[in-house]
Amino acid sequence: MDALVSLCKRRGFLFQSSEIYGGVQGFWDYGPLGVELKRNLKDAWWHDMISGHNELVSPAGAPSTFEMVGLDCTIIMHPQVWKCSGHYDLFHDHMVDCRESKKRYRFDQVRGRFVEYQGTKIFVSTLAEIEQEEDEVRRRGMKFFKLRPKNADELTVEKESLTLDKLDSTDNVLAPDAKTLGTLTEPREFNLMFKTTLGALGGEEDTTFLRPETAQGIFVNFKNVVDSSRVRIPFGIGQVGKSFRNEITPRNFTFRSREFEQMEIEFFCHPNQSQEWYRYWRDRRMAWYTKLGLSNESLIMREHHTEELAHYSVGTADIEYAFPFLPEGEYGELEGIAHRGDFDLRSHMEGKLDPATNPMTVELNEHGKPKHRGSGKDLAYRDDITNEKFVPHVIEPSAGADRAALAFLCEAYTEDEAPDENGKMQTRTVMKLDPRLAPIKAAVFPLVKKDGMPEVAQEIYGALKEHYNVFYDAKGAVGRRYRRQDEAGTPYCITVDGDSLTDKTVTIRDRDTLEQTRVKIDDVVSEIQSRMKAST
């Protein structure tokens, strides 16, 4: 993982936000290559899920035909939205504070191991990455027991890595930044929404929140979309946009950030068909990731147990990826596909529903009134053919664009061997990104900067630039230019050499196979287009 992080900074995929001032934890900036990768990822999602969907044909596995439309909602919404959605009361993580270091940690994210010395057993916790965890636990354990290096074998470190929430007690826990045991407080709830203030006065009535998810903007616009676009159930509304969560301990590169981008669909269907649609979207979303290059061996589909379900969920399945910073055998969430039932639309009609009731009813305050009053608007749907009126059920495929980009970067990072310009095999680093996701689709090189080669190369570059993001490079040995493009994930490199001036052909080199083929100059654009089309 360290090698990938280093490459991402060195080649301009990702930078720590505000790095010249020491950075801000949980915030990341996308560099020139990273912004293209992420844009390509979002474009692929939007095309495959929304704009490219054919509503006249029923896709394989779908119960029927359906429509898809898009939406772009504001980051700041009426505060009542978050009260009725349940986020105001229920959107929290459990945190612990260290009385000694005064630092705060997320209870279920801090890992560690039990260590034992002369019959005394303690739990040493750490924030180190998984690759360094055992060494860091051993180092801190030796320091706690005041052991010298020559006595290192007297300390036993258990192999099993655990998070704090798996322990019966924290009394014998050495906190990540503490020197003594038992300094952690009992876990308590911490609301993850960022507060902000509207207007100049800044009173309590002016307090609102940065959205923690894009979904609620879709729900409160449900009636607007139905009335304006004439869509009929079943249909979906897609949205891509920024969300914000005040994570207690952001970590693992961009995996857990405080500002992130979501790609979400809220799919509205008849309650009687909701389970069929849930299965359809679960399977379709899994297939999307493998089609773009994530291996089946690195992905799992995990159904949530009842006790894991969010307050709004009837059922949820997570698509999870084996990120390299996680312990072997563990997976991190890429996307959740949730069966939200009618929770959201009813909550925004009637008021916040109580998930503890079955069937769910509006949660009341001590005076017997709705705790958080809904809009009072009728968000039920009337079928103009059957005249049936009902509150639609919702299936929500919710993907993180940043986590997906990170997964594709992890999957793409490869070290193999390739010949240099002298034919000697050398280790190369290559990002084997799917051509649809690659930041640069092709690079154009003149072999040397003379004899008319730059002019031909520039003409090819200009023709390709009308269709794709391409790169022109005339500096250095051609082997080093290949290596630079391999690290950028560029699938095709086009070289203009001495023969190009006589036979009017160029060499196209494939990033993954290293195969080089001669193609007529006039056919270069169509050849690249053909190869790009074959990858879709």
From Swiss-Prot:
PANTHER family hit by this protein: DNA POLYMERASE SUBUNIT GAMMA-2, MITOCHONDRIAL, GLYCYL-TRNA SYNTHETASE/DNA POLYMERASE SUBUNIT GAMMA-2
A GO CC term assigned to this protein in UniProt: cytoplasm
Name of the protein in its database record: Glycine--tRNA ligase
Subunit record text: Homodimer.
Residues covered by region (Insert): 56-67, 350-372
The reaction(s) this protein catalyses: tRNA(Gly) + glycine + ATP = glycyl-tRNA(Gly) + AMP + diphosphate
Function: Catalyzes the attachment of glycine to tRNA(Gly).
GO annotation terms (biological process): glycyl-tRNA aminoacylation
Family: Belongs to the class-II aminoacyl-tRNA synthetase family.
SUPFAM superfamilies, per the entry: Class II aaRS ABD-related, Class II aaRS and biotin synthetases
Annotated ATP binding sites: 245-247, 255-260, 333-334, 400-403
GO molecular function: ATP binding; glycine-tRNA ligase activity; protein dimerization activity
Provenance organism: Rhodopirellula baltica (strain DSM 10527 / NCIMB 13988 / SH1)
Principal place of residence: cytoplasm
Record: residues binding substrate: 106, 213, 260-264, 396-400
Transmembrane intervals: none
Record NCBIfam families: glyS_dimeric, PRK04173.1
Keywords tagged on the record: Aminoacyl-tRNA synthetase, ATP-binding, Cytoplasm, Ligase, Nucleotide-binding, Protein biosynthesis
